[in-house]
Amino acid sequence: MQDIEFLYLTRADVIATGVDMQMVMDAVEDSFRLHHAGQTNLPWKTVLDLGERERGRGNAMPAYVGGEYDVFGIKWIAGFPKNPVLHGLPRATGFFVLNDSWKGIPLAIMDCTWLSAMRTGAVTGVGAKYLARMDSESVAMIGAGVQARTQLEALKVALPGLQQVRVYDIRRETAETYATEMAEKLSMEVRAVDNAELAVRDADVVVTVTVADEPIVKDAWMKPGSFFSAVGSYQEEEF
Protein backbone atom coordinates (compact mmCIF):
# COMPACT_ATOMS: atom_id res chain seq x y z
CA MET A 1 0.00 0.00 0.00
CA GLN A 2 1.23 3.46 -0.89
CA ASP A 3 2.71 5.53 1.92
CA ILE A 4 0.91 8.75 2.77
CA GLU A 5 3.11 11.81 2.91
CA PHE A 6 2.09 15.25 4.13
CA LEU A 7 3.63 18.58 4.97
CA TYR A 8 4.41 19.49 8.56
CA LEU A 9 4.81 23.23 9.03
CA THR A 10 5.95 24.94 12.21
CA ARG A 11 4.97 28.50 13.04
CA ALA A 12 8.23 29.70 11.50
CA ASP A 13 7.55 27.65 8.38
CA VAL A 14 4.08 29.16 8.00
CA ILE A 15 5.39 32.70 8.34
CA ALA A 16 8.23 31.94 5.91
CA THR A 17 5.73 31.11 3.14
CA GLY A 18 5.35 34.86 2.63
CA VAL A 19 1.61 34.98 3.27
CA ASP A 20 0.59 38.57 4.02
CA MET A 21 -2.59 40.23 5.24
CA GLN A 22 -3.88 41.08 1.76
CA MET A 23 -3.62 37.41 0.78
CA VAL A 24 -5.44 36.29 3.92
CA MET A 25 -8.19 38.87 3.38
CA ASP A 26 -8.63 37.69 -0.21
CA ALA A 27 -9.02 34.09 0.98
CA VAL A 28 -11.48 35.10 3.71
CA GLU A 29 -13.56 37.08 1.22
CA ASP A 30 -13.57 34.10 -1.16
CA SER A 31 -14.74 31.88 1.69
CA PHE A 32 -17.59 34.25 2.53
CA ARG A 33 -18.73 34.16 -1.10
CA LEU A 34 -18.55 30.37 -1.21
CA HIS A 35 -20.47 30.15 2.07
CA HIS A 36 -23.19 32.39 0.64
CA ALA A 37 -23.32 30.15 -2.44
CA GLY A 38 -23.79 27.04 -0.29
CA GLN A 39 -20.37 25.63 -1.13
CA THR A 40 -19.15 25.22 2.42
CA ASN A 41 -19.93 23.00 5.37
CA LEU A 42 -19.29 24.69 8.68
CA PRO A 43 -20.51 22.69 11.71
CA TRP A 44 -20.72 24.28 15.12
CA LYS A 45 -17.38 24.26 16.90
CA THR A 46 -16.95 21.88 19.81
CA VAL A 47 -15.81 23.58 23.01
CA LEU A 48 -14.01 21.42 25.55
CA ASP A 49 -14.32 22.97 28.99
CA LEU A 50 -11.83 21.87 31.61
CA GLY A 51 -13.95 22.39 34.69
CA GLU A 52 -12.60 25.83 35.55
CA ARG A 53 -13.65 28.60 33.18
CA GLU A 54 -10.77 30.85 34.13
CA ARG A 55 -8.21 28.16 33.32
CA GLY A 56 -8.90 27.78 29.60
CA ARG A 57 -10.54 25.51 27.05
CA GLY A 58 -10.01 23.61 23.82
CA ASN A 59 -11.89 24.28 20.58
CA ALA A 60 -12.37 21.87 17.67
CA MET A 61 -13.44 23.69 14.49
CA PRO A 62 -14.01 21.50 11.40
CA ALA A 63 -14.93 22.90 7.98
CA TYR A 64 -15.17 22.16 4.27
CA VAL A 65 -14.59 24.84 1.63
CA GLY A 66 -15.50 24.08 -1.98
CA GLY A 67 -14.92 26.06 -5.15
CA GLU A 68 -11.32 26.33 -6.28
CA TYR A 69 -10.14 25.32 -2.79
CA ASP A 70 -12.09 22.04 -2.39
CA VAL A 71 -10.47 20.95 0.87
CA PHE A 72 -11.61 20.07 4.35
CA GLY A 73 -9.91 20.11 7.69
CA ILE A 74 -10.02 21.08 11.31
CA LYS A 75 -8.50 23.67 13.58
CA TRP A 76 -7.71 22.42 17.07
CA ILE A 77 -6.91 25.45 19.18
CA ALA A 78 -6.60 25.99 22.92
CA GLY A 79 -7.38 29.33 24.52
CA PHE A 80 -5.71 29.98 27.88
CA PRO A 81 -6.04 33.70 28.75
CA LYS A 82 -3.46 33.67 31.54
CA ASN A 83 -0.68 32.08 29.47
CA PRO A 84 1.12 35.33 28.56
CA VAL A 85 1.34 36.52 32.16
CA LEU A 86 1.87 33.21 33.97
CA HIS A 87 3.94 31.24 31.49
CA GLY A 88 5.22 33.61 28.82
CA LEU A 89 3.25 31.67 26.22
CA PRO A 90 0.65 32.77 23.64
CA ARG A 91 -2.96 32.89 24.82
CA ALA A 92 -3.98 30.71 21.86
CA THR A 93 -2.01 27.71 20.55
CA GLY A 94 -2.92 24.88 18.22
CA PHE A 95 -2.69 23.43 14.75
CA PHE A 96 -4.55 22.88 11.49
CA VAL A 97 -5.06 19.54 9.77
CA LEU A 98 -5.84 19.94 6.06
CA ASN A 99 -7.28 17.02 4.03
CA ASP A 100 -7.82 16.16 0.38
CA SER A 101 -11.58 16.18 -0.26
CA TRP A 102 -11.51 13.28 -2.76
CA LYS A 103 -9.15 10.84 -1.08
CA GLY A 104 -9.48 11.98 2.52
CA ILE A 105 -5.74 11.84 3.06
CA PRO A 106 -4.02 14.54 5.10
CA LEU A 107 -2.24 17.16 3.02
CA ALA A 108 -0.67 19.15 5.84
CA ILE A 109 -0.44 19.60 9.56
CA MET A 110 0.58 23.11 10.48
CA ASP A 111 0.83 25.46 13.41
CA CYS A 112 -2.22 27.72 13.55
CA THR A 113 -1.18 30.31 16.13
CA TRP A 114 0.02 32.97 13.69
CA LEU A 115 -2.34 32.21 10.81
CA SER A 116 -5.39 32.04 13.08
CA ALA A 117 -4.61 35.52 14.38
CA MET A 118 -4.19 36.73 10.80
CA ARG A 119 -7.49 35.15 9.76
CA THR A 120 -9.40 36.76 12.61
CA GLY A 121 -7.92 40.13 11.77
CA ALA A 122 -8.81 39.58 8.12
CA VAL A 123 -12.49 39.09 8.96
CA THR A 124 -12.60 42.58 10.47
CA GLY A 125 -10.67 43.88 7.48
CA VAL A 126 -13.15 42.44 4.99
CA GLY A 127 -16.04 43.80 7.03
CA ALA A 128 -14.47 47.26 7.09
CA LYS A 129 -13.84 47.12 3.35
CA TYR A 130 -17.59 46.97 2.72
CA LEU A 131 -19.14 48.56 5.80
CA ALA A 132 -16.81 51.28 7.07
CA ARG A 133 -16.60 54.77 5.60
CA MET A 134 -13.73 54.88 3.13
CA ASP A 135 -12.68 58.29 4.45
CA SER A 136 -12.16 56.87 7.96
CA GLU A 137 -9.03 58.26 9.61
CA SER A 138 -9.08 57.20 13.28
CA VAL A 139 -9.22 53.87 15.14
CA ALA A 140 -10.00 53.02 18.76
CA MET A 141 -8.39 49.73 19.77
CA ILE A 142 -9.55 48.25 23.08
CA GLY A 143 -7.00 45.63 24.04
CA ALA A 144 -3.36 45.45 22.99
CA GLY A 145 -2.54 41.77 22.63
CA VAL A 146 -1.60 39.66 19.62
CA GLN A 147 -5.02 39.96 18.02
CA ALA A 148 -5.02 43.74 18.31
CA ARG A 149 -1.98 43.75 16.04
CA THR A 150 -3.56 41.78 13.20
CA GLN A 151 -6.82 43.71 13.57
CA LEU A 152 -5.02 46.98 12.93
CA GLU A 153 -2.93 45.49 10.12
CA ALA A 154 -6.11 44.36 8.33
CA LEU A 155 -7.85 47.68 8.88
CA LYS A 156 -4.91 49.50 7.33
CA VAL A 157 -5.19 47.28 4.24
CA ALA A 158 -8.95 47.86 3.98
CA LEU A 159 -8.85 51.57 4.81
CA PRO A 160 -5.56 53.04 3.57
CA GLY A 161 -6.53 56.52 4.79
CA LEU A 162 -6.31 55.55 8.46
CA GLN A 163 -3.84 57.82 10.22
CA GLN A 164 -4.42 57.77 13.96
CA VAL A 165 -4.92 55.01 16.55
CA ARG A 166 -5.82 55.36 20.22
CA VAL A 167 -5.25 52.15 22.16
CA TYR A 168 -6.41 51.26 25.66
CA ASP A 169 -5.42 48.19 27.67
CA ILE A 170 -5.87 47.46 31.37
CA ARG A 171 -2.07 47.17 31.50
CA ARG A 172 -0.68 50.56 30.52
CA GLU A 173 2.75 49.16 29.67
CA THR A 174 1.15 46.69 27.24
CA ALA A 175 -0.61 49.53 25.45
CA GLU A 176 2.61 51.56 25.30
CA THR A 177 4.50 48.63 23.79
CA TYR A 178 1.74 48.13 21.24
CA ALA A 179 1.76 51.81 20.32
CA THR A 180 5.50 51.87 19.72
CA GLU A 181 5.51 48.65 17.70
CA MET A 182 2.51 49.38 15.48
CA ALA A 183 3.46 53.00 14.82
CA GLU A 184 6.75 51.80 13.39
CA LYS A 185 5.28 48.84 11.51
CA LEU A 186 2.39 50.67 9.83
CA SER A 187 3.71 54.25 9.74
CA MET A 188 0.74 55.54 11.73
CA GLU A 189 0.29 57.73 14.77
CA VAL A 190 -0.48 55.29 17.60
CA ARG A 191 -0.78 56.38 21.22
CA ALA A 192 -1.87 54.76 24.46
CA VAL A 193 -4.70 56.39 26.42
CA ASP A 194 -5.86 56.04 30.01
CA ASN A 195 -9.35 54.62 29.52
CA ALA A 196 -11.71 53.15 26.95
CA GLU A 197 -13.80 56.30 26.62
CA LEU A 198 -10.80 58.38 25.58
CA ALA A 199 -10.05 55.81 22.90
CA VAL A 200 -13.60 55.51 21.54
CA ARG A 201 -14.84 59.12 21.51
CA ASP A 202 -14.86 60.48 17.92
CA ALA A 203 -13.20 57.34 16.48
CA ASP A 204 -14.25 56.34 12.96
CA VAL A 205 -13.48 52.67 13.66
CA VAL A 206 -13.80 50.88 17.01
CA VAL A 207 -12.41 47.40 17.70
CA THR A 208 -12.65 45.52 20.99
CA VAL A 209 -10.20 42.64 21.41
CA THR A 210 -10.45 41.50 25.02
CA VAL A 211 -11.75 38.54 27.01
CA ALA A 212 -13.58 40.78 29.49
CA ASP A 213 -16.95 39.46 30.63
CA GLU A 214 -18.39 42.90 31.35
CA PRO A 215 -19.28 45.56 28.74
CA ILE A 216 -16.43 47.96 28.02
CA VAL A 217 -17.77 50.32 25.35
CA LYS A 218 -20.92 52.39 25.82
CA ASP A 219 -23.22 53.42 22.99
CA ALA A 220 -23.05 57.07 24.07
CA TRP A 221 -19.34 57.13 23.25
CA MET A 222 -19.80 55.96 19.65
CA LYS A 223 -19.49 58.41 16.79
CA PRO A 224 -22.50 58.28 14.42
CA GLY A 225 -21.62 56.30 11.31
CA SER A 226 -18.61 54.61 12.87
CA PHE A 227 -17.65 50.99 12.18
CA PHE A 228 -17.60 48.65 15.20
CA SER A 229 -16.01 45.20 15.37
CA ALA A 230 -16.37 43.18 18.58
CA VAL A 231 -13.77 40.40 18.64
CA GLY A 232 -13.68 37.78 21.40
CA SER A 233 -15.96 35.61 23.45
CA TYR A 234 -18.22 38.38 24.67
CA GLN A 235 -20.19 41.30 23.26
CA GLU A 236 -18.36 44.23 24.79
CA GLU A 237 -20.62 47.15 23.91
CA GLU A 238 -23.42 48.26 26.21
CA PHE A 239 -26.53 49.67 24.48
Language-model segments: which ranges?
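NAD(P)-binding Rossmann-fold cofactor-contacting core
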Residues: 158-183
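Short acidic low-complexity segments
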Residues: 186-203, 219-220
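N-terminal Rossmann-fold NAD(P) dinucleotide-binding loop
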Residues: 148-149
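Short glycine-/small-residue-rich Rossmann-like dinucleotide-binding loops
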Residues: 210-212, 232-233
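Glycine-rich Rossmann-fold phosphate-binding loop(s) that bind the pyrophosphate
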Residues: 144-145
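Rossmann-fold NAD(P)-binding glycine/threonine-rich loop
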Residues: 222-223, 231-239
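N-terminal ligand-binding/catalytic initiation module
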Residues: 1-117, 125, 132-135
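Short helix-loop-beta connector
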Residues: 131-138, 161, 223-224
